[in-house]
Structure formats: C-alpha cells, structure tokens
From Swiss-Prot:
Keywords: Aminoacyl-tRNA synthetase, ATP-binding, Cytoplasm, Ligase, Metal-binding, Nucleotide-binding, Protein biosynthesis, Zinc
Binding sites annotated in the UniProt record for ATP: K679
Organism field: Leifsonia xyli subsp. xyli (strain CTCB07)
Keyword set includes Oxidoreductase: no
Organism taxonomic ancestry: Bacteria, Bacillati, Actinomycetota, Actinomycetes, Micrococcales
A Pfam cross-reference name: tRNA-synt_1
Name of this chain's protein: Isoleucine--tRNA ligase
Primary localization: cytoplasm
Residue span of motif 'HIGH' region: 84-94
Transmembrane stretches, start-end: none
Compartments, as annotated in UniProt: Cytoplasm
Ranges spanned by the short sequence motif 'KMSKS' region, renumbered to the chain: 676-680
Length: 1119
C-alpha cells in the first residue's frame, strides 16, 4: 500500500517517482485523512454530485483561505469586486460577471500572486427605497415624511439585505471564492465617512458646486438623475408614442412691423405639449432661411371653422426647407404648390428680437414672474431643419438648451409643476394634472383658440427611469454637481493607461463618453443614502456654508456625533439632519446652520469603493496607496457609463490616477428569445435547475468560452450549457477514467516523466507544452474565450487521437521489469498538467481529478505549470498535426462514400510538398484509416491535374489584344509552371492575373491546404472479409461490456451464424486475430452457447444474416 501523504507536505509539490505497486492505486488517498472512494473511478460521472462533494471539502478544508495565506509575502494582484444589490436574486448577468471575477483571480493565484477577494454590498439609493415602498404600501413621497425617516430608512436597510444568504449560496455554488466574512457595505458608517471625505475634497478643490440645471427627472421617485444613468442600458430608452403639435405664434411689435412681418404666424413644433404653458421664447437658426407662405386655396388648418377673411388670409413663417412638409396643413394640394407660393425669405439672424403674441397669460405679470424679456425670437446655432419647422419653442425650465439660451437673454426659469410633475395652480386650465395627463386638454385649448395648425402621433425613443421604469421628464432643479468638465481632458489622458477588453471600448464607448462628459449631478431628493455633508444658514441675510469630511469634524462643531437609536454613530438621515448649531456669522444669534436635505447619488457611493471599503484616509492609508489602482475589474458593457466611469472620474479628481489598469467590459446575457434576461418573461433556464442537472463547471464553461467576454452578446440556452459537458468535461473525465482503469488493471502508480521516446508520447508532451504557453498568454490577456478554445482543441486531441491510438499500449500494461510504464507516466504527466491549466475554468471537476490522481490537497494550491519543464518538438508537432489533418480529410471521404472505418481499403495517396517527412507516420495513417498501403508523393502538384483560368479583366490592360491568345492557350493546356512562374501562350502571368485549381476527377479525392488526398475504394473479397471480422470484434466487445466484464477478463467465445455465407466470408479474414483482440482463450463457430449471449440482427454490421455472440468468463483457476 502506498503510504499516505503528510498534511504538512507543500501543496505545490509534485509526487516523485515510485516503484511501489498496489492492487488498485487510483484514486490515490488524500492528505486530509479521508479514505478515497472504495469503488474505482466511475465511467458515468454525475458532475453536480462531484461538485457538491468538492464544495464540502473546500468548506471543511479552508482551501480558499489557504490559497491566500500560502501567498503571504508574494506580489499582490489587486482585484476590485463591484458590489451588487442584495434586494433581489442573482440572474445570469450576475453569474456571468461572477464567473469572470473568479477565473482570473484563481489563475493569478496559481501564477504566484496574492489575490484578496473582498465581497461588498451596494445598499443605498432608489433600489432599496423602492423595495421598501413596495413592502410598506407607499405610493407617494409624502407618506414617507409622515411615517418618519428613521422607520422608512430602517425598512430600506432591511430590504436591501434581504437576500444576502441566498446570494452567498449562489456565489458558493458557482465555486466562486470570495471573502464574505470581511465584506463591506456601503451603509456602514466607516464607508460613509470616507464618502463624505471625498465630497469635501472635491469641494475644497473647487470641483463640487451647487447649481440650477435642467436634468433628467423622475416624477415617480421625485428626484433628478445623472446623464450617465440614461446611457447605461439600452432599455432605458424605449419606444413611446406621444402627441406632437405645431402651434402658431403671430408676430407683433415694432421690429415685426419694420420687417413687414406683423401678424405673420410663426410655426413651432414640439413633442411635449405640456411644456407650452411655460413657452417664453422661440429660437431660430442664424443661417437658416425662413419663408413667408400665405394660406393656400384650401385654407390653413388653424383657420378651419373660423371663416373671417383675416384668418383665412393669414401668412405663416417656417424654414424654407420644410415648407413642403406642411403643404397640406397650409392649404395646398402638393409640396410643390406650397413651395411655389413662398412670397419672401429672411435669414434667421434678422429675426432676433421680434416679439410675438403669447399663448396664455399664466405668467404675463412681469412684476411677479420677471417675464419682461419674454415672448421674443432668439437666435442660436443648435436649431436644425432635420424635423419640425426649423423654429423651436422654448420652455427654459424643461430643456437644457432652452435654459441656456433663455438665461442669456434675461428670461427667467419658471417651474410650472410640483415634484410629482403635477401642474401648479398658476396654470389654471390644467392645475393638478400630471404632465402626461395634461396633453389632451392643452391641445383642446389650442384648437379652440385657433393656435393649432397640426396634431400628430409621434413614435420616438424616450428615456425612462432605470429603476421604476416610468417615463422621465427634463426639469430644472437645484442640485450639487461635480465639475467634471474641469478635469475631463485629464480623464481622457489617464484612460490611455488602462488596458480594455475588448480593446475598442477604450477609445470607443468609454473614450467617447469621456470626451463628451458633462458635469455630474450628485444630489438626490431622497432619504436612504450617504448625506451631502453641507450645512447652510437658514437666514439668507446671514449666509454661510459649511462642508464636513469626517465624524471628528462634526463632533468638533456640533458637540456631538449623529447617533441612531442604538447609540451608534450613524450618518444616515434623520440622525445626521438632527445636527444643528447657531450660525457663527449671525451676530443676532437667531439663524441656525442646518444640513441640506439631499443625499448623494448612489453612484457616488459605488465610485468611492476603492478607498471607502477600507475607511481611507482614516485607516489603512498605506494599504490603499499600495493597492490603487486595481490590477483588474470586470462588469458588463453598460458600466462603461456607470461604475467604470465614476470610478475613473473620482480617482482622477481625488488622486490624479486611474482607479484600475485592466478591465473586462463584457457583453450582455440574453434570454432564449433574444431579449435581456427577465424574471417576468422567464426567458432563461432556471439557474438552480442547471446547477442540479449539468453543474456549475458546465455553466462556467459555457459563459467563459463564449464571445460575451469580448463584448458580444450571448443567448443562454440549456443546450449551450450541455455542450460544455460534451466538449470538455466528459473528454477530460473519460481520459481520467481510462487512465485509472488501466493503471488499476496493471497495478501501476504512475510518476511524472517526460522521458518517453514513443512518438505519440513525445507528440502529446510537446502539444501539452504548447497548450501551457498558449493558455498562459490568453489568460494573461484576460481572454478566457481563446483559452477555452485551446483547451477544447486539446481535449479533442487527447481523447480522439492520443488515447484512441494508444489503447493497445495501455491494454498491455506494465510488466514486472517496468516495461510499458512510459505510456502511463506520459498520460499521468499530461493529466496532472492539464488539470492545473484547466483549473480556473473548471475548478470543481479538475479538483476531484487532480486530488484523486496525485493525492495532493488541492489543485488550486499548486503553482501554474511551467512550459519549460515539458519538451518542445516543433518538427514532430508540425508533422503529426499534418497527419491528423490528412486523417480527418480521408475519414470524411470515407463517410462521403458510405464506407465504414472497419472496412479496410487498398490504399491512400497523399501528394504534397514535404511528403517525405510523413514517411515515419505511414503506419499510423494505415492503422488510423484502415488502409493496406500509403503512397506518399513528393511535390505539391506532382501527378495531380490542374486547370489554369486567366482573369481577362486583370490581364487585358497589360497585354491588350493578346489576352485572347493567352486564354485559348490556358484552355488547351499550352501552359507551364516553373519556380512559381506561370506562362501561357508565351506570356508570363503575374499574381492576380490567373487562378490555378486542382482538378478533382476521383469521387474519393480532395485537395485541401496544398495537399491532394485520394482513397482507393475498390473492394476485394479479402477486404470485405476483414471488414466483417472487425465488425465481429466490435460485436464481441459490445457483448463483453453488456456482460460487465473487466478489461482484462479472459473469455471463451462462441460465434453462431444464421447465414452460412457470413461464416465462409469470415474464414477469408486471415489477417485478423479475433482471439487476441477480444481476450478469447478459445474461439468456436458453433451453435449459440455461453454464460452471456447477445444476438445481432442482419445488416447491423456487414452481416447478411443474424449472428449470436456467446461468452463465458474464464476464471483464473480454470486456466
């Protein structure tokens, strides 16, 4: 019996050579004191059960922590784990990212790096609040104020951590190694203190400021959003059908009169009729030509039902390029007629300052509303003629350009709706209506007052809230901003220090987003989040603003810390809001410093993760300085405008360096219907069902081998996951089973060795070296897709070439002198190396195989294989690869001709440059292809007919009329080739002027990659007899397997043929030894007999009639 390994043995050591034998060496005993399975390695693995056993072992053994502890003092590879929300169960998108977060840290650990993997939870913001509202039955923000912020925020806190246990179970079942025990939460006071420190740093640098801007605004959640939140996911913009209106604005005043435009009706188009009550200006383009068009013979649409002459004879102003689009509305029968009716044109710049008749009088009182400069035409370059009328209605509270242009003209920003987007009392006609409800009554008013020229439905892509999914509005709000535009160029420069996968994201989606980055709105009118640490005086006569960046600063000024009900420091509302003090700048002592009510954008929390997770700068300053930037992060492509962007922005602003140096920005996981995975649609396989049926390694392989890590999208299907089982898991396990089966049969415990001189062994070892080099390069480049492809190809080579072609050597076993051990040692060496190379991508199954193969503690505690320890043999690899390619082509020709492989053929002919190099492998080709002879012909085209085709279009310009002579010469065969130069009809042809093609006349011939291959398929009675004999051998092997015999069990064999012709044909097969091939001590052709009998029907093989195989196991005592 082989002695057990000591637990103190270094995990990365390899077993030394052994001469000891035992009856069944494999699986080897493990160092943890557990006995190996009593049964041999199963040929029918249930991978989910194997995985559960491995997970239990890891938990018992503490393998994950050992993988980190073993690398103490080693160089570190820093990984930032983007925190998820735990108020919902993970889906395939999370699993996809989670696998990537495990593959590369595992790989780097095996490469000798120390890789800590600290898990974190994103907890603040709308995701938590919306879930709390749902659970509490809250439908309006006012209900939160009524119940009290402490109770609401506690409910939000409880909801956001609701599924942490389930998340841990999913992550663990993924075989993803993370440190949950030392995880962080963005709601932790230590984390939040680092966040407010960051805000103060930005404020002190002049990069945080308060402003009044038009922002995307969610009326359901009553808070503004940042522009980047609208660009993270494709489904933020959804197709929506709205009513558009084209409205008339009659020109008035002295300038209109001087231009001869008095009473001309300006046409303005809008997709948001609800903004018309706050129309305060119109804008034209300076270089756009505007046309005056009289009402047509059919009458303009705004005059219908109003027959007075003044109305019917009205004139209209719009961009001349768009007149045809309004022909019908203006009363013309065709666009041409409308354009022909234009009476004059005027450039936009000349219209500046012309006043017009406002729609309604809601804000006519200039003393109250400051509208003394309103209702005039302004000029700006943002106006185009792509749609509408070329004249833009301005509501400065509801459009970014509107606000910019109007403020420059001294026109005020007037808010007409409340926080829930309901109209305020000033707009009497629709007061109390929500903006999307107010469209119809407003349009009705416009029609009744003769101001509506056109109403139409308009389908367009419209932004929706990324959390509650309601349509957004744009609305001017008071907000705090990060002045991103001040350091935008620096962000662009630092981006060049980052390696992106896929590479095009650097200067594509991410780079372009950086180049156009705008100031970031970071304040939210909500409750559960990190506070904006700004206190203001409540008396404008004594203004003062204080910004705080630590608990110590708060305690210094307020005399106490913000404490929750448990008496713990807590920066959440309402505890931090309770901190007030007299205004030091108010000599009267009556004003008070109060915190502004807003909280920070949840993305500010996420972007602070690198330093906030360790409470920097209050603790761990040295640690952070040495662990930033990170070596690796990974998330889906949407985070290029989300987490990746905000990490980069805050790191640039605070530390003037990137937050990370390598990043994977993977594609999106789609459901089986091609849509994003959706719980409501149930368009993806249940995760737990896949774990239970196929296992985590199969799912990991499916996701990590797909193009999704290169930025493509991936459709999740059950068949796709199962394909990973077929492609890699089963071939790997089958090779391990094959090795253990024959090693146990011969009682040999293999050793690591690369000394074999056998050509297949040398080839396999050299290919293993190539594999190690290739996978190392791929994983260094964060390309698991290519690495997986290399492993998949190697698995095919291992099982379908090496193992299949080496069966006889393993069957022969190892004798008492050690002869025959080379094959076992080679396959042991390759399996041990392969399981290490595949470990990051198949961590569970490789763990089981490696442990049972080596007796070691864990494959994940070993070092990554060193390719230099394996022999290189480029010439052998090139030659054998060529042999395999020839074999593949020849086998496809067999299949095409309907000739089974067990039927021998007369010969194979191979014509190729360097054919002589294949001579040492003739025996392999004969055996692989079951041919009697292999004919190797030197020269790429020797003995192969070829046809020359002249390209007249390319040759004609060079030789003119002679081209026809050359074409005739090519067709008649009057051409030659010497030293790569083709001559036809006496003319030397240049590359690109001709094509040479091999003429394939034989039905079982093919020309591929410069090699001509032809099979001789003529059959003789002897060849057919040998084919039947090999069919019989296959039938006997099937019978042995059905009888449950071991690979070394000897038998007595009886064959009974219903058709005498089959027996006579079999008698001609003098070259096939059925007895030795089937381990039969005796072979008889007689009546069916034996301990186990199996009948094969006529035509099942090449047999004419039924035949029966009878076998009886011969016990050792009987021999």
């Amino acid at each position: 019996m082989v002695p057990r390994r000591s637990r103190q043995r270094p995990a990365s050591s390899c077993r030394t050579a052994k001469t000891a034998r035992r009856e069944m060496p494999y699986p080897l005993p493990a160092p943890d004191g557990q006995e190996p399975e009593a049964q041999p390695v199963t040929p029918s693995p249930v991978f989910p059960e194997i995985e559960e056993d491995v997970l239990a072992f890891w938990d018992r053994d503490g393998t994950f922590h050992a993988s980190i502890d073993n690398r103490d003092g080693a160089p570190e590879w820093v990984f930032y784990d983007g925190p998820p929300f735990a108020n919902g169960l993970p889906h395939y998108g999370h699993l996809m990212t989670g696998y990537a977060k495990d593959v590369f840290p595992r790989y780097q650990t095996m490469r000798g790096k120390k890789v800590e993997r600290r898990f974190g939870w994103d907890t603040h913001g709308l995701p938590a609040e919306l879930e709390a509202e749902r659970q509490l039955g809250i439908t309006d923000k006012s209900q939160i104020e009524e119940m009290g912020l402490a109770a609401f925020n506690q409910a939000a806190k409880d909801s956001v951590l609701k599924y942490t246990r389930e998340w841990q179970q999913y992550v663990t079942r993924q075989a993803r190694w993370v440190d949950f025990d030392n995880g962080y939460k963005t709601l932790d006071t230590t984390y939040m203190e680092s966040v407010i420190w960051a805000f103060k740093q930005l404020h002190e640098k002049g990069l945080a400021y308060e402003g009044y801007r038009v922002l995307p605004y969610c009326w359901r959640d009553q808070t503004p959003l940042s522009n980047h939140e609208l660009r993270m996911d494709d489904d933020v913009y959804k197709m929506r059908q709205d009513q558009t209106v084209t409205v008339t604005f009659p020109l008035t005043g002295a300038k209109a009169e001087s231009l001869g435009l008095t009473g001309v009706r300006v046409l303005a188009w809008t997709t948001t009729p609800w903004t018309l009550p706050t129309n305060l200006a119109l804008v034209v383009g300076p270089d756009i030509q505007y046309a005056v068009v009289p009402a047509g013979p059919n009458g303009a649409a705004d005059a219908h039902g109003r027959p007075d002459d003044e109305v019917l004879s009205g004139e209209y102003l719009l961009a001349i390029d768009l007149v045809g689009n309004y022909a019908k509305d203006l009363g013309y029968g065709s666009p041409e007629a409308a354009r022909a009716a234009v009476t004059r044109t005027i450039p936009g710049r000349e219209l500046e300052g012309v006043t017009y008749d406002r729609l309604w009088d809601y804000y006519a009182d200039a003393a109250t509303w400051g509208t003394q400069n309103a209702w005039q035409i302004l000029v700006d370059g943002y106006v185009t003629t792509e749609d509408g009328t070329g004249i833009v209605h301005q509501a400065p509270a509801y459009g970014e350009d509107d606000q910019r242009v109007c403020e420059a003209a001294g026109i005020p920003v007037i808010i007409s709706v409340d926080d829930g987007a309901r109209f305020l009392p000033a707009v009497q006609d629709v007061a109390g209506l929500q903006v999307f409800e107010a469209g119809k009554p407003l349009i009705k008013l416009l029609r009744e007052e003769g101001r509506l020229l056109r109403q139409a439905s308009y389908e367009h892509s419209y932004p929706h809230c990324w959390r509650c999914r309601n349509p957004l509005i744009y609305k001017a709000v008071s907000s705090w901003f990060v002045r991103v535009t001040d350091f935008r160029d620096r962000m662009v420069a630092l981006n060049q220090e980052i390696t992106w996968v896929p590479e095009n994201v650097k200067d594509g989606q991410f780079g372009k987003w950086l180049a156009g980055a705008r100031d970031w709105s970071i304040s939210r009118n909500r409750y559960f989040g990190s506070p904006i640490p700004v206190w203001k005086s409540d008396d404008p006569d004594y203004p003062r603003v204080d910004v705080y960046g630590s608990l110590a600063e708060l305690e210094r000024d307020f005399g106490r810390l913000p404490l929750n009900a448990a008496g713990e420091p807590d920066l959440h509302r309402p505890f931090v809001d309770d901190l007030t003090r007299p205004n030091p700048d108010d000599p009267t002592g009556r004003s008070t410093m109060r915190r502004i009510p807003d909280v920070l954008d949840v993305w500010f929390d996420s972007g602070s993760m690198p330093f906030a997770q360790v409470h920097y700068p209050f603790e761990n300053s040295d640690w952070f300085d040495s662990h930033n930037p990170a070596d690796f992060i990974v998330e889906y492509i949407g985070q290029a405008r989300g987490w990746f962007y905000l990490l980069h922005a805050l790191s640039t602003a605070l530390f003037d360096r990137p937050a990370f140096t390598n990043v994977i920005s993977h594609g999106i996981v789609l459901g089986n219907d091609g849509q994003k995975v959706s719980k409501s649609l149930r368009n993806y396989p249940d995760v737990n069902d896949v774990f239970d049926r196929d296992g985590s390694d199969a799912m990991r392989w499916f996701l990590m081998s797909s193009p999704v890590l290169r930025g493509g999208n991936l459709v999740v299907t059950e068949e796709g996951v199962r394909e990973g089982v077929r492609q890699v898991l089963l071939p790997l396990w089958n090779t391990w089973y094959f090795f253990s089966l024959y090693a146990n049969a011969t009682g040999y415990e293999a050793k690591r060795s690369t000394a074999s001189a056998a050509v297949l062994d040398r080839y396999l070892l050299a290919k293993t070296r190539d594999l190690v080099e290739a996978v190392t390069a791929d994983l260094d480049a964060l390309d698991s897709t290519l690495a997986s492809a290399k492993l998949r190809d190697f698995a095919d080579l291992l099982t379908n070439w090496y193992v299949r072609r080496s069966r006889d050597r393993f069957w022969a076993g190892v004798d008492g002198e050690g002869a025959g051990a080379e094959a076992f040692d080679t396959l042991y060496t390759v399996l041990e190396t392969l399981t290490r190379v595949a470990a990051p991508l198949l961590p569970l199954v490789t763990e089981r195989i490696w442990k049972d193969l080596t007796g070691g503690r864990s494959v994940h505690l070993t070092d990554w294989p060193d390719a230099a320890e394996l022999p290189a043999d480029d010439a052998l690899v090139a030659a054998m690869d060529r042999v395999r390619a020839i074999s593949s082509t020849a086998l496809s020709l067999r299949k095409q001709a309907g000739l089974r492989v067990r039927l021998p053929l007369a010969s194979l002919t191979v014509v190729a440059e360097g054919a002589a190099a294949l001579a040492p492998f003739e025996a392999i080709l004969r055996d692989e292809l079951n041919v009697k002879a292999v004919c190797l012909v030197e020269g790429e085209h020797s003995g192969v007919d070829r046809a020359l085709t002249v390209k007249a279009r390319q040759l004609g310009p060079r030789i003119g009329k002679r081209v026809q002579e050359v074409i005739r010469a090519a067709k008649s065969g009057d051409w030659s080739e010497a030293d790569g130069v083709v001559t036809a009809g006496g003319v030397e042809l240049e590359p690109g002027e001709y094509e040479l093609a091999v003429v394939i006349s034989a039905p079982t011939a093919r020309f591929e990659n410069g090699v001509y291959i032809e099979l001789d398929t003529a059959l003789t009675p002897e060849l057919e007899a040998e084919g039947l004999a090999r069919d019989i051998i296959r039938a006997v092997q099937d019978t042995r397997k059905a009888a449950g015999l071991g690979v070394s069990d000897r038998i007595a064999l009886t064959l009974a043929f219903e058709n005498g012709g089959d027996a006579r044909v079999l008698g001609l097969a003098t070259e096939v030894d059925i007895a030795s091939e089937t381990l039969a001590r005796t072979v008889q052709v007689a009546a069916a007999a034996g301990a186990f009998v199996k009948t094969f029907g006529a035509g099942q093989f090449a047999n004419v009639g039924d035949f029966t195989v009878g076998i009886t196991k011969i016990e050792e005592a009987d021999e």
